[in-house]
Amino acid sequence: MIAESMKALVKGSSVIRAMFEEGNRLAKIYGAENVYDFSLGNPNVPAPDEVNEAIKNIVDEEESVVLHGYMSNSGFEDVREAIAQSLNKRFDTHFNYTNIVMTVGAAGGLNTILKTIINPGEEVLTFAPFFGEYRNYVSNFGGKLVAVSPDTATFQPKFDEFEKLINKNTKAVIVNNPNNPTGVVYSEDTIKKLAKIMEDKQKELGIEIFLIADEPYRELAYDGVEVPYLTKYYANTVVGYSFSKSLSLPGERIGYLVIPDEVADSE
């Protein structure tokens, strides 16, 4: 018999994935050009030519044993350092390779950090509407996802409700900015309010509350809209990122976590 937890997971399996599979089925019948797929975030923009050239060069120039061999659990040091320096240049941060952990996409990163911090029965807060897989990610490790109800006029956080939901059992808050599915971007003022509430609650309750910034859509901000980098506003912040959207590479599953030195137990 399979585990009861897995039965429940399969029973509530991803609607997004089900829609994707149904889209594939319909495309075979009516032609892909006649089916509009709004399920998975599969970009319809090709990956940059530079990505394809880099892949070809690596395959041609790297020794096969090295290319296909095991690596450090955290990823290649030079790749992690390059990411750290890119972040420092863009966001005026002070990271180095030790703050970067390569992951299998943003989903792999979120599962990694949640497994690291959650004890069974602890709660993770997020703001509705949210990416549906969050509930599965949290439940994978015995946690409970608690959603702040949406302000359907603006889709901005309802801070009064958020503050009331934080308790001794709260382990983390997931913020998806820009948000999936609404596309809303939380401004610097909004992030500052969020950080202040979390800091005050940490002191009041005598616990560590982690802020998990889920950022696969960071580059999809237009018309001069700026997306705040959350590590600059709250010390206990971990960032999860993926190149799936920014470089149109969802199938490659390339992501990373940023774990600043200031995060509790960062080592």
Kindly give the residue locations of the regions a language model identified.
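Walker B catalytic acidic pair
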Residues: 215
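Short strand-loop junctions, especially beta-strand C-caps/beta-turns
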Residues: 41-43, 178, 242-243
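Short catalytic/ligand-binding loop motif for oxyanion handling, primarily in non-cytosolic enzymes
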Residues: 44-48, 181-184, 219-220, 248-250
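Conserved core segment of the aminotransferase class I/II
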Residues: 235-267
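N-terminal small-domain helix-loop-helix segment of the aminotransferase-like
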Residues: 2-105, 112
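Glycine-rich "substrate-gating" loop/helix at the edge of Rossmann-like oxidoreductase active sites
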Residues: 6-11, 149, 182, 244-245
